[in-house]
Every structure is written in structure tokens, then in C-alpha cells.
Regions:
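A short, N-terminal "cap"/entry segment at the start of jelly-roll beta-barrel domains
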Residues: 1-45
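Intrinsic-disorder/low-complexity, polar/charged segments enriched in Ser/Thr/Lys/Arg/Asp/Glu/Gln
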Residues: 33, 46-48, 100, 110
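Conserved short histidine dyad/triad with adjacent acidic residue
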Residues: 42-62, 96-97, 119
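Conserved hydrophobic/aromatic beta-strand scaffold that supports enzyme active sites
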Residues: 48-50, 67, 92
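Residue-level recognition of conserved beta-strand positions in structured domain cores
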Residues: 50, 62, 79, 105, ...
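A short beta-strand-loop-beta hairpin characteristic of the jelly-roll/cupin
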Residues: 60-89
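Ligand-binding loop in jelly-roll beta-barrel domains
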Residues: 88-89, 97-120
Length: 120
């Protein structure tokens, strides 16, 4: 394997996709999202890139575990019991597979993500 296999997030992403959460998941605002995928494993279980989110709130159901590092903005993550965690630039955390709740972007947000979804 060569040095060319190292993924440099400063380079253009291999794929960029803009999307909205499903209509029934949107609780407020217009939470459009843009995902720049810099790496995706051949087996489809590991992905890494940069995510950008516009203001709004939607329900989430993580089937994958995801490491996040907030680069810009402010978001509030709430669990199914209503307990919340505010994350902002500089925060680093991992959301485990199985987490259910809501994600609210309070100020336009950008994060680096690395997600892994183990498949049977």
C-alpha cells in the first residue's frame, strides 16, 4: 500500500450528497444536510467524512457507532428521555449504535465523522 492511500480531508471528497431527513422525522426548521464522504470501506461498514447541517431538529436512530468532532456551530443532542447534551466547536464524542433521540442544529454545524456499522 502506498502513501497515496492516506485519506486527506483537505482534499475534495470522493462523494458529496445533499439530503433532508424523512419528512416524518423533522420536528422543526429546515434541517438540510450535506455529507462529504472522504472514505468508505469496500465492505460498507466504515465511513469517514465531513457533515454539515442547517438549523432544525429531527429524530435520530443510530444503527452505527459514530465518532464526531464538531468544527463549527452548535447542536443539541437529546435522548429518548429528554436529557440533552450541547455540542460545539472543539467537542469530540462518540454516539454508540442503538442511540435514539433527536438532533437539533441551533447554529449551522459542521463536524468530522467516522462511523462503523457492524453487519451480521
Amino acid at each position: 500500500m502506498s502513501i497515496m492511500n492516506i485519506v486527506d480531508f483537505a482534499q475534495p471528497a470522493k462523494e458529496s450528497v445533499e439530503y433532508m431527513p424523512k419528512a416524518e422525522a423533522v420536528l422543526s426548521g429546515n434541517p438540510s444536510q450535506l455529507v462529504h464522504t472522504h472514505f468508505s470501506s469496500p465492505c460498507g461498514q466504515l465511513a469517514a467524512g465531513v457533515w454539515e447541517g442547517a438549523c432544525g431538529q429531527w429524530t435520530v436512530n443510530f444503527t452505527e457507532s459514530e465518532y464526531c468532532e464538531i468544527l463549527e456551530g452548535v447542536s443539541v443532542i437529546r435522548d429518548a428521555h429528554g436529557t440533552s447534551k450541547t455540542v460545539r466547536a472543539g467537542d469530540r464524542f462518540l454516539i454508540p449504535a442503538g442511540f435514539k433521540g433527536t438532533w437539533e442544529v441551533v447554529e449551522p454545524c459542521k463536524k468530522i465523522f467516522v462511523s462503523v456499522e457492524f453487519k451480521a
